[in-house]
Amino acid sequence: MAIDIKAPTFPESIADGTVATWHKKPGEPVKRDELIVDIETDKVVMEVLAEADGVIAEIVKNEGDTVLSGELLGKLTEGGAATAAPAAAPAPAAAAPAAAEAPILSPAARKIAEENAIAADSITGTGKGGRVTKEDAVAAAEAKKSAPAGQPAPAATAAPLFAAGDRVEKRVPMTRLRAKVAERLVEAQSSMAMLTTFNEVNMKPVMELRAKYKDLFEKTHNGVRLGFMSFFVKAAVEALKRQPGVNASIDGNDIVYHGYQDIGVAVSSDRGLVVPVLRNAEFMSLAEIEGGINEFGKKAKAGKLTIEEMTGGTFTISNGGVFGSLLSTPIVNPPQTAILGMHKIQERPMAVNGQVVILPMMYLALSYDHRLIDGKEAVTFLVTMKDLLEDPARLLLDV
């Protein structure tokens, strides 16, 4: 019996997707719940699994094709796996010349290899037919990073892609995520009256508190490490309560005030920057916030974030400081009306009670939609965050 292989049902926020990778070819056997094809959307990569044991009979949508929700991708002949197995027996005889061919990399694996300057033929593929999977590329990248500094010779054996002095250009299509990010950035710039206000915060109190309790915190909370982001999320939640307009959104001619704080935290992934959301952050402890962010980071690296985890949010925090950014003007993520930018902690001479003191300082930037948020609200929001972070006991005392 023929079974239709269909694209997943997309949520309303996703119009279509792209066939990223077929893991099976026509004539190849599959088992029930085995991965057949990846569909890339502007938010996540969705996996299509086999509904039954059988053989891939036909591929209707090729890699790179655009597909709609529930659209036919191919056909699976149920129960044909047993008869298809003998046909694969002659393959070893023809395998010899295949060794000379360039390895096949999945899109995610190719991106990781390029970003880490790893030659494709140096990665051992564990996928079907020797295909290099994302996990293979990640393992190769980790192996390269952990290689002893005194043994750089193996990495140098890869031949350069282009001769020195060549004026080389390379044209590649945008990923759906990058295209969607570009679209939303242009939309934000053109549809909002966006402004950015700045302040700076003395990070010494938070750093001292973290240094004092980080070991006990990790032991008490089953290995969850105490970072800086949880303090910023806590401070942002309190500041949003005091300035509800910063937590609101515009819907047509209406202002929607949200009685909850869903905080989006920007996380870097192989596909680009993604923003999973901490739901009801106002009820979360420091440990729950850190644990949630850590879990998001792992899922982002593995490409396992779900659409639900990246949908919604009433306010976003972006930390360019992890990349060394000293100052920036983050762009608001519609339909939200504000975003907080964290930056690098850097020691600077500061005047304190008439004395010059070296303090670890961080610039904070709040970009906001001036159609809804007045300058007074934006400045007050940042001042509240500054006050709470410079006296973190207030976060616990709710004062």
Swiss-Prot record:
Chloroplast found in the keyword field: no
Residues the record marks as active site: H370, D374
Presence of keyword Chaperone: no
Purpose of the protein: E2 component of the 2-oxoglutarate dehydrogenase (OGDH) complex which catalyzes the second step in the conversion of 2-oxoglutarate to succinyl-CoA and CO(2).
NCBIfam families on file: PRK05704.1, sucB
Name of the protein described by the UniProt record: Dihydrolipoyllysine-residue succinyltransferase component of 2-oxoglutarate dehydrogenase complex
Molecular function GO labels: dihydrolipoyllysine-residue succinyltransferase activity
Lipoyl-binding domain span: 2-77
Peripheral subunit-binding (PSBD) domain span: 104-141
GO biological process: one example: L-lysine catabolic process to acetyl-CoA via saccharopine
Family the entry assigns: Belongs to the 2-oxoacid dehydrogenase family.
Cofactor descriptive note: Binds 1 lipoyl cofactor covalently.
GO cellular component: cytosol; oxoglutarate dehydrogenase complex
The species this protein was found in: Azotobacter vinelandii
SUPFAM superfamilies linked: CoA-dependent acyltransferases, Peripheral subunit-binding domain of 2-oxo acid dehydrogenase complex, Single hybrid motif
Enzyme Commission numbers on file: 2.3.1.61
Pathway assigned in UniProt: Amino-acid degradation; L-lysine degradation via saccharopine pathway; glutaryl-CoA from L-lysine: step 6/6
Cofactor(s) named in the record: (R)-lipoate
Catalysed conversion reaction: N(6)-[(R)-dihydrolipoyl]-L-lysyl-[protein] + succinyl-CoA = N(6)-[(R)-S(8)-succinyldihydrolipoyl]-L-lysyl-[protein] + CoA
PANTHER family on file: DIHYDROLIPOYLLYSINE-RESIDUE SUCCINYLTRANSFERASE COMPONENT OF 2-OXOGLUTARATE DEHYDROGENASE COMPLEX, MITOCHONDRIAL (PTHR43416:SF5), DIHYDROLIPOYLLYSINE-RESIDUE SUCCINYLTRANSFERASE COMPONENT OF 2-OXOGLUTARATE DEHYDROGENASE COMPLEX, MITOCHONDRIAL-RELATED (PTHR43416)
Keywords assigned by UniProt, alphabetized: Acyltransferase, Lipoyl, Transferase, Tricarboxylic acid cycle
Domain of life: Bacteria
List of residues that carry N6-lipoyllysine: K43
Subunit structure: Forms a 24-polypeptide structural core with octahedral symmetry. Part of the 2-oxoglutarate dehydrogenase (OGDH) complex composed of E1 (2-oxoglutarate dehydrogenase), E2 (dihydrolipoamide succinyltransferase) and E3 (dihydrolipoamide dehydrogenase); the complex contains multiple copies of the three enzymatic components (E1, E2 and E3).
